[in-house]
From Swiss-Prot:
Gene: cybC
Keyword Lyase: no
First-listed, main subcellular location of the protein, grouped into a coarse class: periplasm
Stored InterPro entries: Cyt_b562, Cyt_c/b562
GO cellular component terms, semicolon-separated: periplasmic space
Species name: Salmonella typhimurium (strain LT2 / SGSC1412 / ATCC 700720)
Entry keywords, A to Z: Electron transport, Heme, Iron, Metal-binding, Periplasm, Signal, Transport
N-terminal signal peptide: 1-22
Protein's UniProt name: Soluble cytochrome b562
Names of required cofactors: heme b
One Pfam family recorded for the sequence: Cytochrom_B562
Residues engaged in binding heme b: M29, H124
Length: 128
């Protein structure tokens, strides 16, 4: 009886642990989405920089996660490598927009941030 109870507890902790992990990825996606809206609407350099900085942190954190669609894949699988590569692209695009924002080029930074949507759409089709 005791072994059965321990086995049930171990399995349930794994199940609930992965659900929490998926929520972290979802939270990061929400942060990216919410701040992309700020980037699109703002004309304020400080607000733009803050939104891009939050997006960068969320992208780096999300890159460490495994999307539900890839839970059965090994961490070094081609699919997981491609998933992470998508975040490398995204972070590079955010860095480019952030550089422009830091130079005071708000319009150019916002235009550069448009590429974020293309990257998002491409990788959502694959892994969402």
């Amino acid at each position: 009886m005791r072994k059965s109870l321990l086995a049930i507890l171990a399995v349930s902790s794994l199940v609930f642990g992965s659900a929490v992990f998926a929520a972290d990825l979802e939270d990061n996606m929400d942060i990216l989405n919410d701040n992309l809206k700020v980037v699109e609407k703002t004309d304020s350099a400080p607000e733009l920089k803050a939104a891009l900085t939050k997006m960068r942190a969320a992208a780096l954190d999300a890159q460490k996660a495994t999307p539900p669609k890839l839970e059965d894949k090994a961490p070094d699988s081609p699919e997981m490598k491609d998933f992470r590569h998508g975040f490398d692209i995204l972070v590079g695009q955010i860095d480019g927009a952030l550089k422009l924002a830091n130079e005071g080029n708000v319009k150019e930074a916002k235009a550069a941030a448009e590429a974020l949507k293309t990257t998002r759409n491409t990788y959502h089709k694959k892994y969402r």
